[in-house]
UniProtKB/Swiss-Prot annotation:
Coiled-coil residue spans: none
Topology in the lipid bilayer: Multi-pass membrane protein
An annotated GO cellular component: plasma membrane
Gene: cobS
Function: Joins adenosylcobinamide-GDP and alpha-ribazole to generate adenosylcobalamin (Ado-cobalamin). Also synthesizes adenosylcobalamin 5'-phosphate from adenosylcobinamide-GDP and alpha-ribazole 5'-phosphate.
Compartments, record wording: Cell inner membrane
UniProt organism field: Vibrio cholerae serotype O1 (strain ATCC 39315 / El Tor Inaba N16961)
GO biological process: cobalamin biosynthetic process
Main location: membrane
One Pfam family hit: CobS
Name assigned to this protein: Adenosylcobinamide-GDP ribazoletransferase
Amino acid sequence: MAAILRYQLELFLLAVSFFSRIPVPVSLPYSSERMNQAGRYFALVGLLLGAICALVYSLATQLFSTNISVFLTMVLSLLLTGAFHEDGLADMADGVGGGMTAERRLEIMKDSRIGTYGSSALIMVLLGKYLLLTELADLTSLVPVWLLAYTLSRAVAASLIRNTPYVSDTDSSKSKPLAQQLSGTDVAVLSLTALATLLYFSWQFIGVMIAASLIFRQIFRQWLIRRLGGFTGDCLGAAQQLMEILIYLILLAFLQHEVMI
């Protein structure tokens, strides 16, 4: 049992090292197989990041206004992840916006330079998050909001690996170890982690959020297959960012119509 728990802890720390800038022991064992299995903890890494952001936001509100506290927490989030998912969103936007064929889109996505489409997507998403979070802060505590959004969005993004073709042909791609299909156990861990953050909310909200997550996943997956033939690591980052925005929108819709969440 101790060996099993140690192995799972090592997988979690591997996920932390891949999906964030949080330091982990340099002696952590690594292999492509372990990295693929670590995908099951993508949502748990989100929960950790959300908890850190929630704590810092709570402390910041003791010194600054809500708007400044939200801004500082967003900056912290970017530092914690190295803008990992935002980078994926920008690359995908450039590729899909600038390419006429799937091959050309994938080629553009490999270019590290950011273009007009990527810049526009980043501005809109970051501005959208700021506006939504400041609106939500006037209506409810942001602590459970950070936890839910950071966890569920990553669970949905990682679940795409389960049954979506991987289309990058770059052997050195940073997401290559995650390209294998997730096992049933991996999906179960992702789902249970996300569900844990939903239990704070009402059953009505939980039902809507689960339905919205499944619908978003299906629509985004089909769109990726049509436009690219499958997914790349950049697409997972884009999925996380868009799903996070969707979560904030649904929360705000519930609260503004005075429906209990």
